[in-house]
Amino acid sequence: MLSHPQHTGPSPALPTPPAAGADSRVFRDVVELGRVLREDLAEVAGTGRLPARAALLVDWDSRWAVLRDSLPSSLLDVHDEALGWYRAFLEAGVRVDVLPTDADREGYGLVVAPLLHVLPGATARRLTGYAEGGGHLVATYFSGIVDENDHVHLGGYPGPLRDLLGLRIEEFAPLREGERVALDDGSSGTLWSDRITVTAPETEVWARYADGPLAGGAALTHRPLPGGGSAAYVSTRLDGEHRTALLGRLLAGAGIGSELPEDLRGRVELAVRAGAEYHFLANRTGEPVKLHHLPGTPLSGTTEEGEDARVLAPRGVSVWRVPPRDPAG
């Protein structure tokens, strides 16, 4: 018989068990949610999600493949890398759609494809066509290593993305746990680094390694493409604030801005439903957030504070009806 592990410290805070019945916080919260959906948000029913202008590709084949013990690093984690980029989008106040690698990319101005270790030829061709057609693609370290049959791509890395990115990886230089590498733009990275040879004259080196055996070598690259698109490569796992700063530069190049006022970016997450257009605002912080001069009408989730402000509670969610945007704008 399995025994339960013994806790040596304070008991963790756990959700109320279902058997607690109607006299419990969870039950009351669920009842209140039902009331809000029925009374306050009935008009939202039937609306569709409005796609974002940026996409984040998450590949489950790569997720499982990098868990093997025969790779250069045991610290690789597709989920963590993707989550880091998702957080960067939240900090920038920009909506992003999380998609599988075979999803349609039409309508997306920027596509981030982190740690695509498994890169079938068909996926590589779609990514190349997307960037050459005017889209802005971001690839990261240890991508394009094997195909869908786990056969190594010959000719150098990152496999079929070499020509698009305008570079070749000479050597992998994984970092030990806790080890850091500095870049000459003031940023730093962990987990991984590459020795890169730039092969296309138009490929720009945005940052170089500032210390260690790779000092002076390219770390962040960006290749403008004739069709107006671009292909960027990130060869290390950037720290949070530095990843957010890089993403801001990439978003600006793709012509994508935030739909949130500047004071809400990083604090409030936005989701948008089409139709009359509804904005769902989720407070990511443990503090109340003031919503000043937002367009539209609040339907739920806020309290008034003065004539021109409403307050969104800590971890709270508010829904607003806003005028439909001009499709041409």
What residue spans do the PLM features occupy?
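Carbohydrate-binding surfaces of carbohydrate-active enzymes
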Residues: M1-G329
